[in-house]
C-alpha cells in the first residue's frame, strides 16, 4: 500500500511538473483492446508485419516475444538472469534489445529469434526506436542518443524540451515519420515530440483510463509501450491485462 501511495503521489507531482500551461493535452479515445500477458513487465513494443514484438524487463524475467494479436506466442528468447531488459526495435534482419544498467545492447536475429551479438551503450538503456538511419535511445534523461549502426557510436544527441525546459524520464519510444511518441516514466502521459528539434508538441493524457484500470487491477504498473500498426496506435503498460488501440 505504501508503495502504491508513493507511486500515485509521484505520478501526480511528476505529471504536474512536466506539463506546461501552454502545451496541449489530448485525451485519446480507446477504440479496441486485445489481451496482454499480465506477467510481462513491458519495456518495448512494436509491430513486425501483423505480429507484435514485445521486450520485457526484471532480473531473471527479461525476454523478447513475438505474438499474434490474439495473444498466441510464436517465438521467444530469454536473457540471462543478470540482465534487466529494456526497449527494443527491429532494423533489417536484426532486433536491437537494450539492457538497463549493464551498458549492453543485444543483437537478436529477427526471425526466428537467436542471439547474434552484443555492443556497448554509454549510459543506461531505457527506450529504443529507429530514425534517419540511426538508433534513437532514451536513458531516463531529457536527451535522446543517436547511435550509428556502423560501429554503434553516438553520432548525435537530441534534447527534448517543453517551453525551453528539459523533459526528463523519457522511456519507451515510437517514431512515425518525423514525430516521436515517448512514454514519460511514472506518469500517465505520452509526449508527442517534433524531430529533429526535440520540441514537445502536445501530451497524450491517459490518466483517467489508467485510474479506471487500477481500480480493477491494483497490481498493474505504469503506462509503457507504444506501437504503430501503420494506421493506429496501440498502447499498454507494465503488467497490464490489455493492449489498447487508441485514436487521437
Where are the model-predicted features located?
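Short loop/turn segments that connect beta-strands within beta-propeller blades
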Residues: 67-72, 109-113, 149-152, 194-198, ...
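A short helix->beta-strand "capping" segment at the edge of beta-propeller domains
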Residues: 22-39, 69-72
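Surface-exposed loop and turn segments in beta-propeller and other repeat-based domains
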Residues: 32-34, 74, 78-81, 157-166, ...
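Blade-loop segments of beta-propeller domains
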Residues: 71-108, 113-125
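Beta-strand-rich domains and repeat architectures in extracellular enzymes and scaffolds
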Residues: 31-63, 77-89, 237-241
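Conserved beta-strand positions in repeat-built beta-propeller and related beta-rich domains
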Residues: 53-58, 95-102, 135-141, 182-186, ...
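Beta-rich, blade/repeat-based domains predominating
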Residues: 38-49, 81-92, 121-135, 164-178, ...
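Hydrophobic, well-structured mid-protein blocks that either form specific transmembrane helices
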Residues: 105-163
